[in-house]
Curated annotation (Swiss-Prot):
CDD domains found in the cross-reference section: Anticodon_Ia_Ile_BEm, IleRS_core
Organism of this sequence: Shewanella baltica (strain OS185)
Binding site for Zn(2+): C903, C906, C923, C926
Superkingdom, taxonomy of origin: Bacteria
Keyword Protein biosynthesis: yes
One annotated GO molecular function: aminoacyl-tRNA deacylase activity
Family the entry assigns: Belongs to the class-I aminoacyl-tRNA synthetase family. IleS type 1 subfamily.
Name the UniProt record assigns to this protein: Isoleucine--tRNA ligase
Cofactor: Zn(2+)
Position of sequence motif 'KMSKS' region: 605-609
Gene label: ileS
Lineage of source species: Bacteria, Pseudomonadati, Pseudomonadota, Gammaproteobacteria, Alteromonadales
InterPro entries linked to this entry: aa-tRNA-synth_I_CS, aa-tRNA-synth_Ia, Anticodon_Ile_BEm, Ile-tRNA-ligase, Ile-tRNA-ligase_type1, Ile-tRNA_ligase, M/V/L/I-tRNA-synth_anticd-bd, Rossmann-like_a/b/a_fold
Sites where the protein binds ATP: K608
Length: 940
């Protein structure tokens, strides 16, 4: 054997079987950085059509989690695949750097601004803290193999970006969308600030649910509206609320104009009383009040009670009954307690009737000193006292604990309140912003498409956007307001540009350091500087202008794609849409793609308390980033993305299949020089031409899947190709030819050429997903090439050639099916100990006429396809009783152990072994391959 071993073309490669990714990937990253890989990619696409994916900035606080990884990897896959398609696709990562979470972290270290530290010093500490957080997150993102301009990211706290955010606000003002108003807004008493819609989370909370009677100022007149004359008992309207603390701010009772209301009389505790309730809710209400018998005295429409007065249950004034479309009969009494200072619907209907917007509650959630009964009490703690006072005043009909969904602060996880405060708003309707935004939504492609209806509903129903915050660390609302009239300075837009120029040089502190006289001169005494800061959603929502329109690498090209988690419909997608539409009359994006949240194997959210958190850092240190990237790509991101150790281990198994395929390809390209050894597709052995044709068709499918952002389809097709067409068929068949054919002969070079073309294509297919592995493969491929696969385009060398004499794809598919049947029978023979390996087998195929014609077409080469030493085809009618039936009605099989001698070199059992004097242990084919011109293969 040792004499002939050196005549074989044994596979050889430096590409290791084990990826050892956790150790090797950091080494590759060092090389990428040293070589300036990102800039190489940029240089390779100068002058090409731009594709702009704008990075939604993560918040610069804390370590990245698995959701961050999903987001950044998806973006990286898109950028790399678009680059492979020839686009100039820059990637500028960004960070959101202002806002409350950073303030809270800094407060823990240095205290609140204005106490131990000045506001200016506090802002500087916030800036330092955010920079530290950015550096930590940046290293983690780079470790994932995400390529981008990491040395020049955009930060919302960059002086230039802060200045451009101010400029964006000035354009919104110039377009007439800004107004100041006293409105109820989401208010966190722990933050002491208004919250944006996106900063509100809904959690279950137990609240006191109470039914409260408001006695009519003139009961006799109210009863008369029900057709009851001369009524002598008190008549009350009843409200139901879960916020007793808002009753001091009650200024009306709202009814539905077309709803039927009943006047219901009953006796309880010796007292006769009459209540007004929605007709459809009478039974449920009286059950709550433990009323066993009652009389309905009459019925009337809600419209009959407009402006009728009712006494406040514990304050010394009366309130009107008013009409509103927001009144429903889903729960309660059909009559709504209306406090314009503590509810959006209440405020809107209150404006219609000119009601006072009462706000007895301070920033900290404590009643103001002039609040009767409850001064100095925190609103949530006052609930019990309100209930007790109502009971004392005989106005309480029912009181129970009620579990319901209630808004909470996203940061403190504590219940929030609605509270009327003076704030700055972007109006949804004054200048048609809502209408135009809805039109722009229709012009945008939403992926998945349900995203469109989701954001449409949000835009249809959202209130004006409160953009002001009472915080220290944020971009200032750089406005001057007249001290007497509260009007904006008439030259606000040009003044804002002058302020922006200063911020560009000195950062946001320039506003607080600014003496108004420097800009306003003699007018300075008439105006005051606004001290509010912008909602951070304005910061990130304006980056299409403050960043994309400003940075040269974007070439002034609009944004093609926004890609974030599905929570961003009400967050970044919404704020960007509002600002862009207000500024430019159009959406800032052409496509919006959303991905689902990550959950564990049981569908639960990641939670430290549950102990099911999977940190990306742990995954990369143990399995490698390419395993994490493969999991992301292989998961359908349109729904929840399930991840667990078991799932990641399955990804590692799938990765090994791809790696082993790549290793086989590289090992069998040993000694192949494309410049001199490449066989034209037209001249290849038929099977080689078929596999190149399959690869060419697959490449089109893969490119299409990348273009549609269906990365799970890419991985499915890639795995199918590696496992079935290559692994179970082509690579299995060509091993014999590759190892035993004459080294320089056509049979081997044809095979190597096919392997080379597939390798060139496949390394590009996997590069957007398995970036580290693709780079590793690229460095070992034969032939002259650029330094990195990432500067390449999809491979053009795959030719889909079909000669007139060629066997069709259907033919090879049929042969694959036949081979699978043969393998089953051989495997059974091995289990029965009738043969060892498949080369010990002689197989007889009993086939019908049509199949016989196909099988005999390739003559003696059929045995190479079946991996047997002999393959005979006989008529189906000649099948013996020992022949095994298959899943093909046209085929029966008989396997026998070969009686011929085994060739020492190729291991085939052939009759001629022992008959060649010079090489008594070889078959004729092997002698031809080592001494002659080499065997001729036409088909396989």
């Amino acid at each position: 054997m040792s004499d002939y071993k050196f005549t074989l073309n044994l596979p050889e490669t430096e590409f290791p079987m084990r990826g050892n990714l956790a150790n090797r990937e950091p080494e590759m990253l060092e090389r990428w950085t040293k070589d300036g890989l990102y800039q190489q990619i940029r240089d390779s696409r100068i002058g090409r059509t731009p594709f702009i994916l704008h990075d939604g900035p993560p918040y610069a606080n804390g370590s990245i989690h698995i959701g961050h990884s999903v987001n950044k990897i998806l973006k990286d896959i898109i950028i790399k695949s678009k680059t492979m398609s020839g686009f100039d696709a820059p990637y500028v990562p960004g960070w959101d750097c202002h806002g409350l979470p950073i303030e809270l972290k800094v407060e823990q270290k240095v205290g609140k601004p204005g106490q131990k530290i000045s506001a200016a010093e506090f802002r500087e500490e916030c800036r330092k803290y955010a920079a530290e957080q950015v550096n930590g997150q940046r290293e983690d993102f780079i470790r994932l193999g995400v390529l981008g301009d990491w040395q020049n990211p955009y930060l919302t706290m960059d002086f230039s970006t802060e200045a451009n955010i101010v400029r964006s606000l000035s354009k919104v003002i110039e377009s007439g969308h800004l107004h100041k108003g006293v409105k109820p807004v989401h208010w966190c008493t722990d933050c002491g600030s208004a919250l944006a819609e996106a900063e509100v989370e809904y959690e279950d909370k137990t609240s006191p649910a109470i039914d409260v009677a408001f006695v009519a100022a003139d009961s006799k007149a109210v009863a008369a509206k029900f057709g009851v004359s001369g009524y002598s008992h008190p008549v009350s309207m009843v409200i139901w609320t879960t916020t007793p603390w808002t009753l001091p701010a009650n200024r009306a009772l709202s009814l539905s104009p077309e709803l039927d209301y009943s006047l219901v009389e009953f006796e309880k505790d010796g007292v006769t009383q009459a209540l007004i309730l929605a007709e459809v809710l009478v039974e449920s209400c009286l059950t709550r009040y433990n009323v066993e018998s009652h009389t309905v005295l009459g019925s009337a429409k809600g419209a009959a009670f407009e402006l009728v007065r009712f006494n406040h249950p514990f304050l010394d004034f009366d309130v009107p009954a008013i009409l509103g479309d927001h009144v429903t009969t889903d729960a309660g009494t059909g009559i709504v307690h209306t406090a314009p200072g503590h509810g959006q619907d209440d405020f809107v209907v209150g404006q219609k009737y000119g009601l006072e917007v009462a706000n007895p509650v301070g920033d900290n959630g404590v009643y103001k000193p002039d609040t009767e009964y409850f001064a100095g009490q925190h609103v949530f703690k006052a609930n019990d006292n309100v209930v007790a006072l109502l009971r004392e005043k005989s106005a309480l009909l029912n009181h129970v604990a009620y579990r319901h969904s209630y808004p909470h602060c996203w940061r403190h996880k504590t219940p929030i309140i609605f509270r009327a405060t003076p704030q700055w708003f972007i109006s949804m309707d004054n200048h048609g912003l809502r209408t135009q935004a809805l039109k722009e939504i229709e012009q945008t492609q939403w992926i998945p498409d349900w995203g469109q209806s989701r954001i449409e509903k949000m835009v249809e129903n959202r209130p004006d956007w409160c953009i002001s915050r009472q915080r220290t660390w944020g971009v200032p609302i750089t406005l001057f307001v007249n001290r007497e009239t509260e009007e904006l300075h008439s030259d606000s837009v040009s003044l804002m540009e002058r302020v922006a120029s200063r911020i560009e040089q000195q950062g946001i502190q320039a506003w607080w350091d600014l003496d108004a006289a420097e800009l306003l001169g003699d007018e300075a005494e008439q105006y005051r500087k606004v001290t509010d800061t912008l909602d951070v959603w304005f910061d990130s929502g304006s980056t299409f202008s403050s960043v994309v329109a400003a940075r040269p690498e974007f070439h002034g090209h609009g944004v093609d794609l926004y890609l974030e988690g599905s929570d961003q419909h009400r967050g970044w997608f919404m704020s960007s849409l509002m600002i862009s539409t207000a500024m430019n009359g159009k959406a800032p994006y052409k496509q919006v793609l959303t991905h689902g949240f990550t959950v564990d194997g049981k569908g639960r959210k990641m939670s430290k308390s549950i102990g099911n958190v999977i940190a990306p850092q742990t995954v990369t240190n143990k399995l490698g980033a390419d395993i994490l990237r493969l999991w992301v790509a292989a998961t359908d991101y349109s729904g929840e993305m399930t991840v667990s150790d078991e799932i990641l281990n399955r990804s590692a198994d799938a990765y090994r299949r791809i790696r082993n395929t790549a290793r086989f390809l590289l090992a069998n390209l040993n000694g192949f020089e494309p410049a001199k050894d490449l066989v034209a597709v037209e001249d290849m052995v038929a099977l080689d031409r078929w596999v190149v044709r399959r690869a060419a068709a697959l490449q089109q499918e893969i490119i299409e899947a990348y273009e549609q952002y269906n990365f799970h389809i890419v991985t499915q097709k890639l795995m199918q190709f590696c496992s079935v067409e290559l692994g179970s068929f082509y690579l299995d068949i060509i091993k014999d030819r590759q190892y035993t054919a004459k080294q320089e002969g056509h049979a081997r070079r044809s095979c190597q050429s096919a392997l080379y073309l597939i390798s060139e294509a496949m390394v590009r297919w996997i590069a957007p997903i398995l970036s580290f592995t693709a780079d590793e493969v690229w460095q070992l491929l034969p032939g002259e090439r650029d330094a990195y696969v990432f500067t390449q385009e999809w491979y053009q060398g795959l030719k889909s050639v079909t000669l007139a004499t060629d066997l069709s794809d259907d033919y090879w598919q049929q042969l694959l099916t036949v081979r699978n049947e043969v393998n089953k029978v051989i495997e059974q023979a091995r289990r029965d100990k009738r043969i060892g390996g498949s080369l010990e087998a002689e197989v007889t195929l009993f086939a019908d006429a049509a199949l016989t014609e196909q099988l005999t077409h390739i003559g003696d080469e059929l045995r190479f396809v079946l991996l047997t030493s002999e393959a005979k085809v006989l008529p189906l009618a000649d099948a013996t009783s020992e022949a095994v039936e298959t899943e093909l009605a046209s085929l029966k099989l008989l396997v026998a152990s070969s009686t011929a001698e085994k060739c020492e070199r190729c291991w085939h059992h052939r009759e001629e072994v022992g008959t060649i004097e010079a090489h008594p242990t070889l078959c004729t084919r092997c002698v031809t391959n080592i001494e002659g011109d080499g065997e001729v293969r036409l088909f396989a």
